[in-house]
Amino acid sequence: MDRYILSLDEGTTSARAIIFDKNSNVLGIGQYEFPQYYPKPGWVEHNPEEIWEAQVKAIKTAIEKAKIEANQIAAIGVTNQRETTVIWKKDGKPVYNAIVWQCRRTAEMVEEIKREYSDVIKEKTGLVPDAYFSASKIAWLLDNVPGLREKAEKGEVMFGTIDTFLIYRLTGEHVTDYSNASRTMLFNINKLEWDEELLEIFKIPDGILPDVKESSEIYGYTKILGPEIPVSGDAGDQQAALFGQAAFEEGMVKATYGTGNFILANTGRMLLYSDNLLTTVAWGINGKVNYALEGSIFITGAAVQWLRDGIKIISNAAETEELATKLESNEGVYFVPAFVGLGAPYWDQFARGLIIGITRGTGREHLARATLEAIAYLTRDVIEEMEKLIQIKELRVDGGATVNNFLMQFQADILNKKVIRPVVKETTALGAAYLAGLAVDYWESMEEISQLWRAERVFEPQMDEKTREKLYRGWKEAVKRALGWAKVVS
């Protein structure tokens, strides 16, 4: 009987399930969207029950489309939007909506903590203090949901990022992996354990925290599909994508183009620190931990969604390529999509979106092009920071926006580096599948996985240096004008 791996890819706007075979081929995909809720300006929430329902439907659809039986699934891997915070009771019922990674409700709380503890947090967690991470979200829930702090002190509730919530629902086990734990701002990445001092700073009882495991091991078994199936892979979405790109060697870099852009560089066993980038755990396997440098860009693909749903100048994302190629250049129009502040390398919670360079002749093609170019500029901002510490020859790319050939070519041009798009686009889900499969000997080794990675297209830089640097200077000027804007108008 042929065996397969089921990967659960729980994103910011949809839950997906993908069936992979031993050669990394996709046999079936299920995908269901779920809503985001915005109770106040800057607040972003999900209903965890809607995530679970969407995930279960996605699993069933993927199995149907793959035309396989549940007993052919050798293992399940989980990958997830990171930092998003859920607290639930022991019966699995959430006590409040999930607070999403994009949510800014705790920005002022974090600013206060940052003044006193910024260096401590950076040294222990590798993170820049920001409302983006889980710690302040947990603190907010404990302080604002009636009776929750008391329940937490008694050990009656559990905290988890979305992976932990899904694994608990699947297996009854309260666990996470190193990569997800490293995004909470409570996990010491040197000692690989929850940190007492950080828990004290945020006033979080340790009894609500999950056990931290390797990224590839059996966490428990699920009978949700009938037969007992091991759940044996877990990694945050960006770390999973790095693994799915087979970026196993030091200095290998990938960029995922999704709701936001996330650039990770494998630094091997080395903990490298940068003032403007995050240091994070890439994965833990076979008793060894790999670290990574990360640049997190909050809004990229979401800016394209805004063109479609916000100002309604396109009907679908693919239109942006067609519109952008109608112009020879951006004609001086820049768009800084700082809808929720700016992440790496700026780390300005108070930056806001800006479109500059508009004239009477500016049309929707200019806005479409400026949006795509912004994604590439933001990515270069991060790569330049990384190159202060490591040498980067090429960029492996994945995520929805990589189908946009204009964007990929412009990315190669503005970086002056090769941009390589793989055959298998589902690298995040594939990474979780690989981690799950390794734990049950479906794949024997990381060397075997490396042999499966194949390039679909290589984009070579074609732009002359003078044009490249002129465009980038314009971008830097536009960003300056966006920084701190929320403070100016508050």
UniProtKB/Swiss-Prot annotation:
Catalytic activity: glycerol + ATP = sn-glycerol 3-phosphate + ADP + H(+)
InterPro entries: ATPase_NBD, Carb_kinase_FGGY, Carb_kinase_FGGY_CS, FGGY_C, FGGY_N, Glycerol_kin
UniProt enzyme class: transferase
Binding site for ATP: 12-14, 259, 301, 305, 400
Keyword Plastid set for record: no
Pfam families for this protein: FGGY_C, FGGY_N
Domain of life: Archaea
Pathway the protein contributes to: Polyol metabolism; glycerol degradation via glycerol kinase pathway; sn-glycerol 3-phosphate from glycerol: step 1/1
GO biological process, one term: glycerol-3-phosphate metabolic process
CDD domains, A to Z: FGGY_EcGK_like
Keywords, in A-Z order: ATP-binding, Glycerol metabolism, Kinase, Nucleotide-binding, Transferase
EC number: 2.7.1.30
Entry GO CC: cytosol
Residue sites binding sn-glycerol 3-phosphate per the record: 12, 82-83, 132, 237
Binding site residues for glycerol: 82-83, 132, 237-238
Function of the protein: Key enzyme in the regulation of glycerol uptake and metabolism. Catalyzes the phosphorylation of glycerol to yield sn-glycerol 3-phosphate.
Record's protein name: Glycerol kinase
Originating organism: Pyrococcus furiosus (strain ATCC 43587 / DSM 3638 / JCM 8422 / Vc1)
